[in-house]
């Protein structure tokens, strides 16, 4: 049975993706920021790994043995005073997860983007989503952007 590593699992889309993966028989390992564990209540069969996409040096061991990484991390608004920005959580997090996946020998990488993302987008949200897509496209992994 293939193990899938999921980031952003505690979010709205992430919750649905985890549910679908479990229903289809995948072994699921979720990266969970400390304090957000309750969002995955009811998923008894998943592995929960405490961590942060902005601290990739602590994630390598967690991704080992996984056949795929599904990166669903994203924010709708920034909270710069708390270090939460589009650049960090869309662009840097994607680069981090790709590097960790590559280092761990993961073959498949799935990246969630957003409708309206394109070159020359006017909103910073879409600009950083586009930058993340470009980072994925440049990677050596077998990738899909949704």
Model-derived regions: residue spans:
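NAD(P)H-binding glycine-rich loop region in Rossmannoid oxidoreductase-like domains
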Residues: 36-104, 115-121
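Rossmann-fold NAD(P)-dependent oxidoreductase module
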Residues: 16-20, 100, 135
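Conserved beta-loop-beta element that borders a ligand/cofactor-binding pocket
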Residues: 107, 113, 134-146
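Short alpha-helix in the Rossmann-fold core of NAD(P)-dependent oxidoreductases
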Residues: 87-91, 110, 129
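Structural motif
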Residues: 3, 67-68, 108
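SDR active-site strand-loop-helix element
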Residues: 7, 31, 72-73, 109-115, ...
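Catalytic tyrosine of NAD(P)H-dependent dehydrogenase/reductases that use a Tyr as the general acid/base
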Residues: 125-126
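N-terminal Rossmann NAD(P)H-binding glycine-rich loop of SDR-like oxidoreductase domains
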Residues: 2-26, 30
């Amino acid at each position: 049975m293939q193990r899938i590593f999921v980031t952003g699992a505690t979010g709205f889309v992430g919750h649905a993706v985890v549910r679908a993966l479990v229903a289809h028989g995948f072994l699921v390992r979720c990266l969970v920021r400390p304090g957000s564990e309750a969002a995955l209540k009811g998923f008894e069969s998943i592995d929960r790994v405490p961590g942060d996409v902005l601290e990739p040096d602590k994630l390598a061991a967690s991704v080992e043995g996984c056949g795929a990484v599904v990166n669903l991390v994203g924010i709708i608004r920034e909270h710069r005073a708390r270090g939460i920005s589009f650049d960090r959580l869309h662009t840097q997090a994607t680069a981090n997860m790709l590097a960790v996946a590559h280092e761990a020998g993961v073959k498949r990488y799935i990246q969630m983007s957003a409708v309206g993302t394109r070159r020359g987008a006017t909103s910073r949200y879409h600009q950083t989503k586009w930058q993340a897509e470009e980072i994925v496209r440049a990677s050596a992994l077998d990738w899909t952007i949704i």
